[in-house]
């Protein structure tokens, strides 16, 4: 992890040939935004404003669907916080809204939750899992208040975060936890059907303006739809 698929075979072969002398964390060593130098231009065009995590959490608690863009992208097929769409999984029809009006994909496709590592046991049966940071396992959901991330068999493909592994996600959860009894958020990759996970601000804003996503947050700047 976080890149357990055929596309990472060459990297695995390299590590097998020459074992690293220390642990190498490649989670967020993917592509930078190719138009990062134009961020201020987009801020001016959209009238974007900078928010703190409390304000972002309030939008999510209010039922808004928010795209998040921070730093370089993730390595591998999992969106682990730097290229993510997040929303409140306590809302019963959120899965259907995302599939039909944002991701444009089949109705049955599931979504993943993320929560703080130290709180995961409250909502998920994590007893038999050593590492849940990479959305690689599906523990059983222990509560019935998370319909939008619970699979038909009662499991969910969980990602846990710490302040060290993803400070933005962790702070967002801290603030969301002050607003909700169930401190879990829904996370899905920031792309729409037929497109890869985004690699530019232009891609992020295209998705915003061509789906029913409500907002995009880029490095804590809030972008709304162009009027």
Regions inferred by a protein language model and the residue ranges of each:
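Flexible beta->alpha loop and helix N-cap segments adjacent to enzyme active/binding sites
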Residues: 1-227
């Amino acid at each position: 992890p976080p890149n357990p698929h055929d596309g990472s075979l060459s990297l695995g072969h390299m590590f097998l040939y020459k074992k690293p002398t220390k642990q190498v964390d490649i989670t967020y060593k993917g592509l930078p935004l190719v138009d990062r130098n134009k961020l201020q231009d987009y801020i001016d065009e959209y009238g974007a404003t900078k928010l703190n995590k409390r304000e972002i959490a309030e939008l999510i608690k209010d039922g808004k669907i928010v795209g998040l863009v921070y730093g370089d992208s993730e390595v591998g097929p999992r969106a682990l916080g730097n290229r993510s769409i997040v929303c409140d999984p306590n809302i019963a029809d959120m899965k259907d809204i995302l599939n039909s009006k944002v991701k444009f994909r089949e109705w049955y496709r599931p979504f993943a939750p993320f929560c703080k590592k130290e709180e995961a046991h409250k909502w998920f049966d994590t007893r038999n899992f050593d590492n849940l940071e990479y959305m690689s396992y599906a523990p059983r959901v222990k509560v019935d208040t998370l319909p939008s991330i619970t699979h038909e068999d009662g499991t969910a493909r969980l990602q846990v975060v710490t302040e060290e592994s993803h400070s933005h996600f962790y702070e967002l959860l801290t603030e969301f936890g002050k607003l909700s009894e169930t401190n879990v958020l829904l996370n899905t990759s920031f792309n729409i059907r037929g497109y890869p996970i985004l690699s530019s601000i232009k891609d992020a804003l295209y998705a915003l303006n061509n789906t029913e996503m409500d907002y995009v947050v880029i490095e804590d700047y809030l972008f709304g739809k162009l009027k």
